[in-house]
């Protein structure tokens, strides 16, 4: 099996976090800070898709608490370095992308969603949920 394409979908969704200001309010003999809302915001949600020649598509949202998007430069570099490779060779691809991180001036872990997509592909190919591929503690 080979990776044939890597795509990115971008959605604008309302976030759970609203913008706010803090104001001091009297609270007995003391004061305390109270938030005053400034409305909800929409945020981009990036979803990475890794397609294979076997028709299996690995899907994962991008990011964590530190970042929620994939830059165009990272997506293009990922395509150059991963398309045409075996999606089951996760360790080799991870080592290659970790080594490339310094030359790209990208944050460590920028390719984490790609790794999750590879696990999704492996799970679909095996007919198992990813949690069973990873194992569990009894």
Report each predicted region and the residues it spans.
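Metal- or metallocofactor-binding catalytic centers and their adjacent structured scaffolds
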Residues: 51-125, 136
């Amino acid at each position: 099996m080979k990776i044939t394409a890597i795509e990115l979908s971008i959605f604008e969704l309302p976030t759970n976090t609203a913008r706010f200001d803090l104001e001091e309010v009297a609270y007995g003999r003391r004061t305390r800070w109270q938030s005053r809302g400034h409305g909800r915001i929409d945020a981009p949600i990036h979803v990475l898709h890794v397609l294979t020649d076997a028709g299996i598509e690995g899907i994962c949202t991008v990011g964590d608490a530190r970042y929620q998007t994939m830059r165009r430069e990272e997506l293009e570099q990922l395509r150059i370095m991963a398309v045409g490779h075996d999606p089951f060779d996760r360790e080799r691809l991870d080592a290659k992308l970790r080594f490339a991180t310094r030359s790209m001036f990208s944050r460590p872990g920028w390719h984490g969603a790609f790794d999750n997509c590879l696990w999704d592909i492996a799970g679909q190919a095996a007919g198992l949920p990813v949690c069973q591929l990873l194992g569990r503690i009894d």
